[in-house]
Regions:
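Short regulatory helix/loop adjacent to the ATP-binding pocket of P-loop NTPases
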Residues: 99-100, 123, 128, 141-154
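Conserved AAA+ ATPase core "coupling" helix
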Residues: 54-58, 135, 145-177
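Walker A/P-loop
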Residues: 12-47, 77, 108
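A short beta-strand-to-loop transition that corresponds to the Sensor-1 phosphate-sensing loop
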Residues: 89-91, 112, 133-143
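Conserved catalytic/switch belt of AAA+ P-loop NTPases
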Residues: 90-129
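AAA+/P-loop NTPase substrate/partner-engagement loops
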Residues: 38-67, 75, 95, 166
């Protein structure tokens, strides 16, 4: 339904989706080969597994030697647009520390449609980045490990696992031929 709305109105405000499912169920492929191609938007992948420092998302102040902008701005630069499909993998694997909570706070800001038109990267301290048209998609396995405020902002979809017979068909028809 949401994808249909974006197809009809490409300038629609961004959406935040979360896909829950066991590893190997095709969550990444669905988004990369399905959603981003249907919408004709660039796909960007960001691994959150083991993330321990929010600066990888929002950069470092340019006054520090060797500093650079964060991954969010890097995605915008590489995609050359303001409305990519940004896929955050393993949301439930963010470190369970105060630094991990900082990461969850930034992700909460990104998914807040009332304020994500003014995202700040520390490297570009005086510039606002309008992320209101970006589509944010998250994947996770264990819902209990997701920040409750962030979880509340996400439209949740469940991807089930496969039976052994289904896995054999997928392997024979799609994986082995590649």
């Amino acid at each position: 339904q949401m994808i249909g709305l974006w197809m009809v109105n490409p300038k629609a405000v961004g959406t935040s989706i979360a896909i829950k499912g066991p590893p190997g169920t095709g969550k990444t492929t669905l988004i990369k080969e399905g959603v981003s191609k249907i919408l004709n938007r660039p796909f960007a992948f960001l691994a959150l597994g083991g993330a321990t420092d929010s600066s990888f998302l929002e950069g470092h102040s340019y006054t520090y030697e060797g500093s650079t902008w964060g991954k969010v701005v890097d995605i915008l630069l590489k995609c050359k647009c303001m409305n990519p499909v940004i896929y955050f993998d393993e949301l439930d694997k963010i470190s369970d520390t105060p630094k991990g909570e900082e990461i969850a706070g930034i992700l909460t800001h990104l998914t807040d449609t009332t304020q994500n038109d003014k995202f700040h990267d520390k490297y570009f301290s005086s510039a606002d980045f309008n992320l209101s048209r970006a589509m944010f998609i998250f994947s996770y396995n264990d819902e209990s490990k997701i920040n409750p405020i962030l979880k509340n902002r996400l439209y949740k979809i469940t991807a089930g696992g496969y039976e052994n017979k289904q896995k054999c068909v997928i392997a024979n028809d799609y994986l082995i031929p590649k």
